Amino acid sequence: MNPMEEVRIFKVTLNIGVGEGGEKLARAERLLEEMSGQKPVRTHSKVTNPEFGIRKKQPIACKVTLRGERAEKVLKMFLEGIGNRLKASQFDEYGNVSMGIDEHIDIPGMKYDPEIGIFGMNLSVTFEKPGHRINRRRIQRRKVPQKHRVSREEAIEFMKEKFQVKIV
């Protein structure tokens, strides 16, 4: 296979949507830091929603972006927690995959801590092929051609080969 056509993981993003700030959000941040080894960043609400008691620009969630070996390690742990099974509908047209878990204690290696509690979380994996830097660089920025973008089928094949995931 052409080395420029090999699919690779660009980033893994872990997200916990708490829905409120304060102590609960701080506990979610501690959990993400414990899982990933990186300090999470807070995300803020975009609009005011009085039904949920949320004001605009209020911190309501936290996320952490992982790259490299750390991303693969966390992805393997997460996949074991959901039983190494994914639905084909979890892959989008650009080959990205998103999954969620209801309780973080289902992930191997994670223990229940009464100070933190139990949180559910979402994980998104972004795939790319070598050469995608042309889309991000500052000088002579270009679009990635359609034939060089990662397709749904390529991402599914990558997950089957590298992580032995079953597609249901």
Swiss-Prot record:
Database matches in InterPro entries: Ribosomal_uL5 (IPR002132), Ribosomal_uL5_arc (IPR022804), Ribosomal_uL5_C (IPR031309), Ribosomal_uL5_CS (IPR020929), Ribosomal_uL5_dom_sf (IPR022803), Ribosomal_uL5_N (IPR031310)
Molecular functions per Gene Ontology: rRNA binding; structural constituent of ribosome; tRNA binding
One GO CC term, this protein: ribosome
Pfam hit, one: Ribosomal_L5_C
Parts forming coiled coils: none
GO biological process, one term: translation
Keywords assigned by UniProt, alphabetized: Ribonucleoprotein, Ribosomal protein, RNA-binding, rRNA-binding, tRNA-binding
HAMAP family associated with the record: Ribosomal_uL5_A (MF_01333_A)
Described function: This is one of the proteins that bind and probably mediate the attachment of the 5S RNA into the large ribosomal subunit, where it forms part of the central protuberance. In the 70S ribosome it contacts protein S13 of the 30S subunit (bridge B1b), connecting the 2 subunits; this bridge is implicated in subunit movement. May contact the P site tRNA; the 5S rRNA and some of its associated proteins might help stabilize positioning of ribosome-bound tRNAs.
Subunit note: Part of the 50S ribosomal subunit; contacts the 5S rRNA and probably tRNA. Forms a bridge to the 30S subunit in the 70S ribosome.
Family: Belongs to the universal ribosomal protein uL5 family.
Descriptive protein name: Large ribosomal subunit protein uL5
Native source species: Methanothermobacter thermautotrophicus (strain ATCC 29096 / DSM 1053 / JCM 10044 / NBRC 100330 / Delta H) (Methanobacterium thermoautotrophicum)
Lineage of the organism: Archaea, Methanobacteriati, Methanobacteriota, Methanomada group, Methanobacteria
